[in-house]
Amino acid sequence: MRKINLLDLETTNKIAAGEVIERPFSVVKELVENSIDAGAKNITIEIEDGGQKLIKIIDDGEGIYPIDIKNAFLPHATSKINSIEDIYKISTMGFRGEALASISSVSKTKLKSRVDSYNFGKEIYIEGGKIEYLKDTGCNVGTTIEVSDLFYNVPARLKFLKSARSDSSSISDIVNRFILSHPDISFNLINKGKQSIKSYGTGNLKDSIRCVYNKTISENLINFESHKDIISVYGFIGKPEISRKSRTNQSIFVNKRYVKSKFITAAVENAFKSFLTVNSYPFFVIFIDIFPEYIDVNVHPTKSEVKFKDERAMFKTIFDAVHEAIKGELKESFTNFFNKEDINIYDSEKSITEPIKLEKEEVQIPIDLNSNNKIDIFGNNINKLPNNTELLKNIGIKEKNTLENNNDFYTSKQNEIYYANKNDECLNSCNKDNYSKIEKSLQKDNKNPDILYLNEHNRNSSPINIKENKSNNFYVDMKIIGQFNNTYILIEKDKELYIIDQHAAHEKVLFEKFKCEIEKGYVISQILLSPVVIELSEDEFNIYEENKDIFKNSGFSVETFGEYTINIKEVPLILGKPNVENLFMDILYNLKNMKSKETSTIKYNAIATLACKSAVKANDNLKEEEIKKLIEDMLILNNPYTCPHGRPTMIKFTLKDLEKKFKRIQ
């Protein structure tokens, strides 16, 4: 073993500088943070050759007292803290006292500063960590610091610097982050003598966003905020139309400090998930104000990462705030179309009495298969039941013939079905306040030989009174124009044209129903006539074992036999007739790509998304009744505006929009 050497001060300072000062933009970041901590309201940054030749920062802050000028350049000399306990209560941008010492050890540094109570200031010049002079000077209140010839005395670092263009871009980026985090401060970036960036310190975050980005982005923002006991989350998220294919337009600020956080990014992106298309990333500027003792900023040399005491609670707070803001914005856009006051929903709160019991007794109810009445297996259309008929918890249905033609959205064919109680919360999606209308009738007295008999369980259940629908005025001012390419439904309402993607809309309806069934534990399954056997690899089998409860709660009945072989006996009813093996493997690979710490809710949503995609029919020629049915199903959803993959389910054109297209108006 070689002899252990004690490094000299110059060497240790250069090594320390390598941790704090990576490139010229690191110098700008550290010095601007010092200016902000000094209370500056106007900060000018001048650079030459991407900051490699010169970085000059001018501020109008409080300045440095003459007695402290020399001490400011000593390692770990700071005015921000006194002891280790202060680190966990820090509210300033800097606190370690490393920046000036590190910068001056690898450059030629000149600093001038004056405080308001002195008539003159002090000037100090340091070259390679050595003080060349310290003298009195005349200057304005505040601080001016010049850093030239960065890394001139560290050739190993100098040769790894990027191009001047690249470093200029990095400096512009960090200045833009400061503009966003401190809209009350005016920033001015001058590159090679020309103004590159200018903000005006109005204190309005939207003005800062417009300065950093452009008018289009600033006009397509959604404000959000959420305030808890120890944390406030607020800022702006971009509407789906300004999403990008990269995360460059995302900014996170914790106590005004720009940080990078994968879990905060994940919280925002998961909130956006059903509103954006695949591989699109949302625009957002998010601020998190939290008591300093609940975070640790001392986990990275550049303070670009933070740790939170309770990441799960933080995730939920951010997710809820962003998700509600997006839903509210989309809901506002389609207020005229989704005016639920026009729909006369029956009062289910008054119709439910005792809890449902689980005793069984078989009763046969005949249903005429040749009549125009159909069974809605998703639970929105049952009407004019025979007197004293009870809707009960589990109804086993064995189909004898097909119930409807191939264009029927809502009929399952040739499956053994387990049918849920009409008053389950899940039956009408996730909207607890709205229950579906009663439309179609089940007829009792038809003697036709094509009769389907239902085995009705839970005879001792409490009766549920069904009110017959009164006429409503939702369709009075709505005109169904028709379909285009058997894919898009054209509707006129209140002098506005709505175009609905029928497949995306149907997928959303199924998704919300399935997701709610999972959440409430009421998933309806169908038994496969022939169980599906799948041989898995060891890795695939381990993923299944890790998530087998997720599959079970989602309506899959899976047995294992052999070493890595599974047998799928039941799948969710909502799937219709899927390719079971392909669907199962798609879900498995989707779960594999998720992190193990992802919440079960996210995993269930992923399963529901894949499952409902497999259930949607394509290119159906819909009857007017089916179009109305689809619209009614959308009405009871909390978020009918986008499909589970983020594509819009509908778009709207006002009369003014169309007249602009045809140049009738300007």
From Swiss-Prot:
Q: Does the keyword Ion transport apply?
A: no
Q: Which UniProt keywords apply?
A: DNA damage, DNA repair
* GO biological process, any: mismatch repair
Pfam families with a match to the protein in the record: DNA_mis_repair, HATPase_c_3, MutL_C
Q: Name one GO molecular function term.
A: mismatched DNA binding
Q: Which GO CC annotations does the UniProt entry carry?
A: mismatch repair complex
Q: Which InterPro entries match?
A: DNA_mismatch_repair_CS, DNA_mismatch_repair_MutL, DNA_mismatch_S5_2-like, HATPase_C_sf, MutL/Mlh/PMS, MutL/Mlh/Pms-like, MutL_C, MutL_C_dimsub
Q: Does the keyword Iron apply?
A: no
- Homology family: Belongs to the DNA mismatch repair MutL/HexB family.
NCBIfam families this protein is in?
mutl
Job description of the protein: This protein is involved in the repair of mismatches in DNA. It is required for dam-dependent methyl-directed DNA mismatch repair. May act as a 'molecular matchmaker', a protein that promotes the formation of a stable complex between two or more DNA-binding proteins in an ATP-dependent manner without itself being part of a final effector complex.
> What is the name of this protein?
DNA mismatch repair protein MutL
| Gene that specifies this protein | mutL
